[in-house]
């Protein structure tokens, strides 16, 4: 098991052994630093808090400055907690975690925040087919249709598919494969796409299956 924080750089394509172009995502994973070690005695569970990036101290609140100073590391941009089982390593506060914990061919799960699409109607958001394109139809082409009768059920059921804000949610993609590890640049090349926009932070964890 292994886990790390990374920043999505963008997408590219790599040719496989069969000379077929495969879409890949490039992630700058680390170096990360252990900002806190949580133990059963103090916190009731075992976990590692990882920090990535480096921020100016003036931009960080005083309590956070003290938190990072206690670990002997610079303030980070993003802090995420991973269970000890997910990490699969015995780490100390302040120690570094690099991409070298992964190798090519490893199966991973990547979690991030999907791209926000803004307000979307039911056709785009839920793949509704829309109204009939027939004679007399004027404005029902992309409408949701009935969402609850006046007399029965005389209400709209909770969870009814309607227009609304689309995207911008936490998404986890499973069954991805690491194609290449570039330790000197702290880069992971992962086959396929991962959630999020460019420069957004993602969590990479070894697949449990």
Swiss-Prot record:
Region (Disordered): 127-164
Signal peptide: none
A single cellular component GO annotation: cytosolic large ribosomal subunit
BP terms from Gene Ontology: translation
TM region positions: none
InterPro entries: Ribosomal_uL3, Ribosomal_uL3_bac/org-type, Transl_B-barrel_sf
Keywords linked to the UniProt accession: Ribonucleoprotein, Ribosomal protein, RNA-binding, rRNA-binding
Record's keyword annotation contains Lyase: no
GO MF, one example: structural constituent of ribosome
UniProt keyword RNA-binding present: yes
Pfam families for this protein: Ribosomal_L3 (PF00297)
Role: One of the primary rRNA binding proteins, it binds directly near the 3'-end of the 23S rRNA, where it nucleates assembly of the 50S subunit.
Name of protein: Large ribosomal subunit protein uL3
Species for this entry: Chlorobium phaeobacteroides (strain BS1)
